[in-house]
């Protein structure tokens, strides 16, 4: 009964099915861990959500920025971001709202002491140890799954504040927690988020670090599994930090990481690479 962490699917239903065939997935016994961004940009977000929703073994899911965007559209009155969105089919589906309520009750962080794994969409803020990250994930999850979710989704967007402080309260506190868990790529040497630069490591400004290389980063006792960052193409500089967004939608692959032995499996995705 293996566990598999799956990289950013982003509505790519056919590659997901091919990947599950490759790993000989047994839906009655195996457990899937989805690193987030189940939806958007790809052609089949509704099919992806319906499939994952129907799995007999409850999957572990950490929400990504595109998942939160869908929830903002469904429940927060957020406007369409632009022509790249492919969420209309979900929005118009008879079960779209039901799927949205299921999605908003998913996690920001999942962990297993038995597997020595912690998973989140973008990573763990350099300023947080594991205990802090778990506590803040629980705090945001309580809002998403609680009665005030409409208010949060209506106001979640924004790049400020851009650094964690224990003194933060209210929406500012929730927004920076959200941005670290779902949007983070680069930080400065003090752990301050930079949400502007999204390119390759080789061309990054000198003052920016990948979040997992920030000099002041607190050590996390478990292996970290994260997605979100297709430009890494599954590579990080740390043997215990596993990047599994391999650009399925951008000329790369869709990747599964078997958590028992950290072995990777991949199938081709769609499109032409943006990262060569």
From Swiss-Prot:
Keywords: Hydrolase. CDD domains: MPP_ApaH (cd07422). Gene3D superfamilies: 3.60.21.10. Pfam families: Metallophos (PF00149). It catalyses: P(1),P(4)-bis(5'-adenosyl) tetraphosphate + H2O = 2 ADP + 2 H(+). The keyword Protease does not apply. The keyword Manganese does not apply. InterPro entries: ApaH, Calcineurin-like_PHP_ApaH, Metallo-depent_PP-like. Coiled coil: none annotated. Its EC number is 3.6.1.41. Disulfide bonds: none annotated. One of its GO terms (molecular function) is bis(5'-nucleosyl)-tetraphosphatase (symmetrical) activity. Hydrolyzes diadenosine 5',5'''-P1,P4-tetraphosphate to yield ADP. HAMAP family: ApaH (MF_00199). Belongs to the Ap4A hydrolase family. This is Bis(5'-nucleosyl)-tetraphosphatase, symmetrical. It comes from Legionella pneumophila (strain Corby). The lineage of its organism: Bacteria, Pseudomonadati, Pseudomonadota, Gammaproteobacteria, Legionellales.
């Amino acid at each position: 009964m293996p566990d598999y962490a799956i990289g950013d699917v982003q509505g790519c239903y056919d590659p997901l099915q091919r990947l599950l065939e490759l790993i000989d997935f047994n839906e009655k016994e195996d457990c899937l861990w989805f690193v987030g961004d189940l939806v958007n940009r790809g052609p089949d977000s509704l099919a992806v959500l319906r499939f994952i929703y129907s799995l007999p073994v409850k999957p572990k899911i950490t929400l990504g920025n595109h998942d939160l965007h869908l929830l903002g559209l469904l429940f927060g009155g957020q406007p369409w971001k632009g022509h790249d969105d492919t969420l209309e089919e979900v929005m118009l589906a008879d079960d779209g709202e039901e799927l949205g309520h299921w999605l908003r009750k998913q996690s920001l962080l999942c962990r297993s002491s038995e597997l020595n794994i912690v998973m989140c969409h973008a990573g763990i803020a350099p300023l947080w140890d594991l205990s802090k990250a778990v506590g803040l994930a629980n705090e945001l999850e309580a809002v998403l799954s609680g009665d005030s979710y409409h208010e949060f989704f209506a106001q979640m967007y924004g790049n400020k504040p851009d650094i964690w402080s224990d003194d933060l309260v209210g929406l500012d506190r929730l927004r920076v927690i959200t941005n670290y868990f779902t949007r983070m790529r680069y930080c400065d040497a003090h752990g301050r988020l930079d949400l502007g630069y999204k390119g390759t490591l080789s061309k990054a400004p000198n003052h920016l670090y990948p979040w997992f290389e920030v000099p002041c980063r607190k050590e996390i006792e478990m292996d970290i599994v994260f997605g979100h960052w297709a430009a890494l193409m599954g590579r990080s500089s740390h043997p215990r930090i596993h990047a599994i967004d391999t650009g399925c939608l951008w000329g790369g692959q869709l990747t599964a990481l078997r958590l028992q032995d950290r072995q990777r499996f991949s199938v081709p995705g769609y499109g032409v690479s943006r990262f060569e």
